[in-house]
Amino acid sequence: MSGFRGLVPELENSLWSSPTTSCMSKMCWWLLWGILHTCPTQASVLLAQQSPQQLTSPGYPEPYLKGQESHTDIEAPEGFAVRLTFQDFDLEPSPDCEGDSVTISTGGTDATRLCGRQGSPLGNPPGHREFVSSGRSLRLTFQAHSSSKSKITHLHKGFLALYQAVAVNQPNGDTEAVTTPGAPKIQNHCQDPYYKADQTGTLSCPSSWKWKDRQDGGEVPECVPVCGRPVVPLAENPNTFGSSRAKLGNFPWQAFTSIYGRGGGALLGDRWILTAAHTIYPKDSIYLRRNQNVEVFLGHTDIDELLKLGNHPVRRVVVHPDYRQHESHNFNGDIALLELEQRVPLGPNLLPVCLPDNETLYHSGLWGYVSGFGVEMGWLTTKLKYSKLPVAPREACEAWLHQRQRTEVFSDNMFCVGEEMQVNSVCQGDSGSVYVVWDDLALRWVATGIVSWGIGCGKGYGFYTKVLSYMDWIKRVIEGKD
């Protein structure tokens, strides 16, 4: 049997010999490591493995019965915690979830009570939240109160959740058992191809019961997101202008934002959104303060589907200190970071973009892509579109502005994209989205620019925030030093 068996000495025997006072029937049965222990009292114990396993409400996906209550305790081995996420959730909503509910107790001070339907404003559905135990165990309580009308509800099917054991301080990693004589040890793995370990090696578990690196005695390696490598890469197109419809997975870092209006952004890591400062503090005298309602949607190319997936609440908004909202002709410092309340689960439709590390990614004539949900031919689009555009010579953009007697600041912290006589399909609603180029050395897509400003929609150049100029600031913010 694979998994954690053999990793925790004596745990196996103690589980098999442990008395179960709540099970008074010979119908009770045990199967170790992740299989349900069922009792007539509807109390159960699940032992988490490193691979995700399913937990559902009784009868799922059929409508659940009214008048039942069940308690499920999920336990992880020493040195691991339990992580639980909901893939589907559909319970009858009620005020404060006093009716049908799922209650999650992670070992902290407060339990979380959930109800309603995923994506609905009614009740308190789990959305994208991850529930991670503070210790080795997590309890899920499912309650379906009796109904005077019928024992069956024909509207609500219950829930489907995934649970797994994760190494402490390593929320996105898996481990593989190595059952050799001596101290237990594991070979660390991350969830390919979306995460990678920041170090490699075999971990051992000495008598202190703390996992250590066998080479240097360090702590469990951290799994970090893999950036700039879409599972569904773009098909190679000729150097033509205009916009095209993106396929699901082409631009998995694309964010759709709703603040003062629609805008864009890009996922960094699994918790940050890179965007333009002017989407938060618009260059308009009527907007004196930042809108408190900042919504972020991720994981799809269709706005209707994005709304169904739900908003990712924002914990913190950080705007670059050089940005001046009241200077309408100066977009210097037009960059901001949004920290999400919860880490997002990465997958084929949701992956981060990489950040630049050298000037060669800004050479004139280098082709890149910009994507967004902005205006197209005068209409708001509901589908993600993208355009292929070249980095333009700086002198050409300066001359173009001078010919039109424009007074906008074109600083060294900006660059321009496009060609003077060709169509520039970037327009209102694309602000905050990123311009990406392919890094031939690192073999990944890099966000070199942020859609910042332009002169109308149509022909001509677009002007972008140069991300490389702000890399030190980005690192300080993400590391909590700014």
From Swiss-Prot:
| List of catalytic residues | 278 (charge relay system), 334 (charge relay system), 431 (charge relay system)
Q: Does the keyword Signal apply?
A: yes
Query: Which GO BP terms sit in this record?
Result: complement activation, classical pathway; innate immune response; proteolysis
Location of the Sushi domain:
166-225
The record's account of tissue expression is: Expressed in liver (at protein level).
Entry-listed glycosylation sites: 358
TM ranges: none
Superkingdom of this entry's organism? Eukaryota
Fetch the InterPro entries from UniProt.
CUB_dom (IPR000859), Peptidase_S1_PA (IPR009003), Peptidase_S1_PA_chymotrypsin (IPR043504), Peptidase_S1A (IPR001314), Sperma_CUB_dom_sf (IPR035914), Trypsin_dom (IPR001254), TRYPSIN_SER (IPR033116)
- What family classification does the UniProt entry report for this protein? Belongs to the peptidase S1 family.
Descriptive protein name: Complement C1r subcomponent-like protein
Q: Record the organism.
A: Mus musculus (Mouse)
